């Protein structure tokens, strides 16, 4: 499977609790944090849910 590099680019202030929980489940806490994950259906769904807060690149 391919790896993806995910960066949090927008703040979580004022977001719904489920969106904050999704970002935290991806391992992101602060703006500018970067994590790498395998591109599984679960991770893809989480990225889709909060895509407007993230920057996603191939790793």
Swiss-Prot record:
GO cellular component: a single term: cytosolic large ribosomal subunit
One Pfam short name: Ribosomal_L30
GO biological process: translation
Family matches, as InterPro entries: Ribo_uL30_ferredoxin-like_sf, Ribosomal_uL30_bac-type, Ribosomal_uL30_ferredoxin-like
Keywords noted in UniProt: Ribonucleoprotein, Ribosomal protein
GO molecular function: structural constituent of ribosome
Keyword Membrane carried by entry: no
Entry keyword Ion transport: no
CDD domains: Ribosomal_L30
NCBIfam families found in the cross-reference section: rpmD_bact
Subunit structure of this chain's protein: Part of the 50S ribosomal subunit.
Family, as annotated: Belongs to the universal ribosomal protein uL30 family.
Protein known as: Large ribosomal subunit protein uL30
Source organism (scientific name): Clostridium botulinum (strain 657 / Type Ba4)
């Amino acid at each position: 499977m391919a790896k993806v590099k995910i960066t949090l680019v927008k703040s979580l202030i004022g977001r719904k609790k489920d969106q904050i929980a999704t970002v935290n489940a991806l391992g992101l806490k602060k703006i500018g944090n970067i994590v790498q994950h395998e591109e599984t259906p679960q991770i893809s769904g989480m990225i889709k849910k909060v895509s407007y807060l993230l920057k996603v690149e191939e790793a």
